Amino acid sequence: MSTAKGNNAENRRPIYNPISNVESLENYVPGGYHPVMVGDVLHDRYRVVDKLGFGGYSTVWLAQDTQLKCYVAVKVGTVNSPVRETTVLRELSTAMSVPAPASQGRRSIPSPLDEFELRGPNGIHPCYTMALAECDLRTVSYSQLFPIEVARALSGGVVLAVAYLHARGYAHGGMP
């Protein structure tokens, strides 16, 4: 970090050299991201171990559940998150008649394990925990392509999950 030079102290503000593949520091403002650090304990239960990722409306952290003695993903939303994801995920996990083959996609929709709020300097942040995913497909496929059988199975699973979402009246807005 360096400082912008100006005629007086009021014109001096920090200039940050951006790092790729991380959220913007400018989003750590009221209404934005909640500051989380490795070692923090969230909700008197989840000890933060590492950062898993981020999106436009959240950061995701690997944490140890100190009660159940297992690892979970903790998603910490921004104050201004447009929707409560947990409401949608819980609704999607409830039994409802959906035509086949879309009904097969229900297995791919995770259910939240716990839901809570964090109060911080930027506001009140919605949070929830999930079971950890097996791996990050983008990272795994970066070094080499999947065998065709694996690629077909993964693609088929995504298609079934999206078909299930659509059959339930939802559309996923964050797909590349």
Give the role of each language-model region.
Residues P99-P126:
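Short beta-strand micro-motifs within the conserved protein kinase catalytic domain, predominantly
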Residues M1-V41:
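Juxta-kinase regulatory segment immediately upstream of eukaryotic protein kinase catalytic domains
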Residues I124, E134-P176:
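Conserved alphaE helix
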Residues D44, A63-T66:
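Active-site beta-strand termini and strand-to-loop segments that position acidic
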Residues V48-G55, V60:
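Protein kinase glycine-rich loop
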Residues A73, C127-T129:
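Conserved hydrophobic/aromatic residues on the N-lobe beta-strands of protein kinase domains
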Residues L52, G77, L113-R119, A133, ...:
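Residues forming the ATP-binding cleft of Hanks-type serine/threonine protein kinase domains
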Residues D65-T94, P99:
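ATP-binding glycine-rich loop module of kinase domains
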